Regions:
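Membrane-embedded alpha-helical modules
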Residues: 146-149, 153, 160, 165
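Membrane-interfacial helix-loop-helix
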Residues: 1-30, 56-149, 174-189, 196-212
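Transmembrane alpha-helix interface/packing and boundary motifs in multi-pass membrane proteins
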Residues: 30-52, 193
Length: 212
């Protein structure tokens, strides 16, 4: 319940962090983005809504420089995916063969299928899809994708993801109608983010049922 409250009221919690920790807010946000993208067992952290809220608070409070914020979180996202890639390269194949309560194998399989269809561009697309952005670099590592290719997609994906959400938050986060309905907006961002995954899962289920 606490996690759900944090996600839906992420702006209030970030404002509290800014008040209590000041400049350390950069380190807190860096750590959250790094952990979400870097550890395959932590796909539930609120990346999209967090970035939007951070951009909005950078505009409204002046406590964070948007350029510094964007640069640091870009680095966090790149390093996180890089760590996840190497974890996948080291233990990935074994994860597909065993049952684990820490890693949802179905998410891994779905991401692998997405890779088969879209190739390296999956690293870019997955940045905007919760769960997929955590599993994509892991699957890339497990599939032994060439690191140079992975890094190029990683850099592009991180730039697009971090840049777009922080910019949108900075521009629109303090528009009165947005500010007054921030919780609803965050909920909307979450729904839109997970919608592609839901559609893909539903299509796969229907296709499987038809084939049988």
């Amino acid at each position: 319940m606490e996690l759900i409250d944090f996600i839906l009221h992420v702006d209030d919690h970030l404002l509290e962090f800014i008040t209590n920790y000041g400049v350390w807010i950069y380190a807190i946000l860096f750590l959250i983005i790094f952990v979400e993208t870097g550890l395959v067992v932590m796909p539930f952290l609120p990346g999209d809504s967090l970035l939007f809220a951070a951009g909005a608070l950078a505009a409204s409070t002046g406590a964070m420089n948007p350029w510094t914020l964007g640069a640091l979180l870009f680095i966090a996202a790149v390093l996180g995916d890089t760590l996840n890639y190497h974890i996948g390269r080291y233990i990935g194949p074994r994860v597909f063969e065993i049952e684990s309560r820490f890693i949802n194998k179905q998410h891994l399989i779905n991401t692998q299928k997405f890779f088969e269809k879209h190739g390296g561009k999956t690293i870019i697309f997955a940045r905007f899809i919760p769960f997929a952005r955590t599993f994509a670099p892991f699957v890339a590592g497990a599939g032994k994708m060439d690191y140079k290719f992975f890094l190029s997609y990683n850099l592009i994906g991180a730039f697009c993801w971090i840049g777009s959400f922080i910019t949108l938050g900075y521009i629109f986060g303090n528009v009165p109608v947005v500010k007054d309905n921030f919780t609803h907006l965050i909920f909307g961002i979450i729904i839109i983010s997970i919608l592609p995954g839901i559609i893909g899962f539903t299509r796969a289920k229907l296709k499987k049922k038809i084939n049988h």
